[in-house]
C-alpha cells in the first residue's frame, strides 16, 4: 500500500528535471557544460538592497511579522502599483508570500473547486498546469501560435459556464512575448462579456522589457479591476530569486482567504527578506536601465546567431530573458551516432550529450518542437553555447 495521497498522481515532475539531472551527471564526470537553462538573472542583488537586509538583522528584526507582510512592505507595494501601473490598492488588498509561486498557489487553493476551468495560454510557465490539477480544477490549454499570444477569438472559443480563471503571463516565460495595450484592450472586451471569469496576471517579468511599454490588464480596462489579481514579486527585476518574496493584489475577501491559508502553512514570509524587498521597491531603480540594456544586447546577439543555425528559427522577444526557438527544421534528422531526432526532447538530449549545451525542451511549456534558451549568462557563455548549437545543427543536417 502506498503512503502517498491520491492527489500526488495529479502532478508530475517537470520534464526539465531530466535535463538537469543529465547535466549534473556530466558535470560530475568533469565535463564543462554550457548551461543556457537558467530561470533567474545572472547578476547579483544590488548592494543597497543587501545593505537593508544587513541593517534589519543588526536591528533585531528577526521575529514573526504579520502573516500577510509587514506594514512597510505592503505600503511599498501599494506605492509601486500606483507608480508603475496607475492602480490604487489598500493594505487589505495585498498579501505578501514566500515568492510569487506561493501566492499563486494559495490563490488557486482558495478559489478553485473541483471541475472549475482555468484557461491557460500555451506556451506557459511549467507550474500553472500542476497547480490547477492539484486542486481538482481543469486546465484548458490554448495553443497560441500567433506570436505566442492569446487572441480574443481564441479566448471566446474557450470560455464556458465553468470557467473561473484566465491566466495572463506578460512578458511570458518561456517566449518573452508581451501583450500590447491594444491587445489587452481587445481581450478585455471579451472578458467584459463574461462576468464570471476572473483574471490572474503573472507580471513577474514586468521590469525586463525592451522595445514596448508594459501594461497590465486592470490598468488597460478599469472595469475589470475587481476581477483581476496581480501576482508579482522582486525575484526577477531585482535579482532576488533566493530571497523568496512575492505578492498578490486584488479583491480584499479573496486576499483575506489567501492570508488565512498562509497562516496555516508557512506563516509570514522571511522578515529579513521583507526588509530587503521594501528597499528594492522604494529605493534606487537606476540599475534597471543598465541591466535591461545588457539583456537587450544579449537578446540581439542570440537572435542573430541562432537564426543562422540551419533548421532553427527564432523570433524576437519583447521581454524576459528567454528565446523560444523552433527546432522543426532538425526533426527527422540523424545525429552522428545515427539516432533520429523525433522531437524537441530528443534535440535537447542531443545538444547536451553530444555538444555539452543544456537548454529546456518546449514540451515542458506546453508546446512541442521548440526549445527554451536563457540568455541570463555571460557573453562568453552565450557565444560558446550558440557556436555549439550551430555546430550541432550542421552535424545532424549533414549526417
Describe the residue ranges of each PLM region:
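Substrate/cofactor-recognition hotspot
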Residues: 8
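PLP-dependent class I/II
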Residues: 2-4, 12-14, 19-22, 26-32, ...
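A glycine-/small-polar-enriched, mobile loop at the entrance of the PLP active site in fold-type I
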Residues: 37-40, 55-73
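Conserved N-terminal alpha-helix of the aminotransferase class I/II PLP-enzyme fold
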Residues: 64-97
Amino acid at each position: 500500500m502506498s503512503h502517498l495521497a491520491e492527489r500526488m498522481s495529479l502532478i508530475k515532475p517537470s520534464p526539465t528535471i531530466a535535463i538537469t539531472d543529465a547535466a549534473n551527471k556530466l558535470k560530475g564526470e568533469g565535463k564543462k557544460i554550457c548551461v543556457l537553462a537558467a530561470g533567474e538573472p545572472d547578476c547579483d542583488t544590488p548592494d543597497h538592497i543587501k545593505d537593508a537586509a544587513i541593517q534589519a538583522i543588526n536591528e533585531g528584526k528577526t521575529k514573526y511579522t504579520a502573516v500577510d507582510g509587514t506594514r512597510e512592505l505592503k505600503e511599498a507595494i501599494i506605492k509601486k502599483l500606483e507608480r508603475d501601473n496607475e492602480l490604487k490598492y489598500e493594505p487589505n488588498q495585498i498579501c505578501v508570500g514566500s515568492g510569487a509561486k506561493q501566492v499563486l498557489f494559495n490563490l488557486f487553493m482558495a478559489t478553485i473547486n473541483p471541475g472549475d476551468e482555468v484557461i491557460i495560454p500555451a506556451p506557459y510557465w511549467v507550474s500553472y498546469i500542476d497547480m490547477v490539477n492539484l486542486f481538482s480544477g481543469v486546465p484548458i490549454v490554448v495553443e497560441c501560435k500567433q506570436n505566442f499570444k492569446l487572441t480574443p477569438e481564441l479566448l471566446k472559443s474557450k470560455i464556458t459556464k465553468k470557467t473561473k480563471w484566465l491566466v495572463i503571463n506578460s512578458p511570458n516565460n518561456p517566449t518573452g512575448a508581451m501583450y500590447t495595450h491594444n491587445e489587452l484592450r481587445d481581450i478585455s472586451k471579451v472578458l467584459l462579456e463574461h462576468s464570471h471569469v476572473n483574471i490572474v496576471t503573472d507580471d513577474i517579468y514586468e521590469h525586463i522589457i525592451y522595445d514596448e511599454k508594459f501594461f497590465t490588464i486592470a490598468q488597460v480596462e478599469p472595469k475589470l479591476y475587481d476581477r483581476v489579481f496581480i501576482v508579482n514579486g522582486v525575484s526577477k527585476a531585482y535579482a532576488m530569486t533566493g530571497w523568496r518574496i512575492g505578492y498578490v493584489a486584488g479583491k480584499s475577501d479573496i486576499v483575506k482567504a489567501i492570508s488565512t491559508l498562509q497562516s496555516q502553512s508557512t506563516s509570514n514570509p522571511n522578515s529579513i527578506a521583507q526588509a530587503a524587498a521594501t528597499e528594492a521597491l522604494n529605493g534606487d531603480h537606476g540599475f534597471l536601465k543598465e541591466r535591461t540594456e545588457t539583456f537587450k544586447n544579449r537578446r540581439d546577439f542570440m537572435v542573430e546567431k541562432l537564426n543562422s543555425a540551419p533548421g532553427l528559427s527564432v523570433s524576437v522577444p519583447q521581454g524576459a530573458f528567454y528565446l523560444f526557438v523552433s527546432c522543426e527544421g532538425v526533426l527527422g534528422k540523424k545525429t552522428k551516432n545515427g539516432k533520429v531526432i523525433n522531437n524537441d526532447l530528443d534535440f535537447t538530449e542531443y545538444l547536451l550529450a553530444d555538444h555539452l549545451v543544456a537548454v529546456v525542451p518546449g514540451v515542458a511549456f506546453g508546446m512541442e518542437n521548440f526549445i527554451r534558451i536563457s540568455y541570463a549568462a555571460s557573453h562568453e557563455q552565450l557565444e560558446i553555447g550558440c557556436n555549439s548549437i550551430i555546430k550541432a545543427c550542421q552535424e545532424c543536417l549533414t549526417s
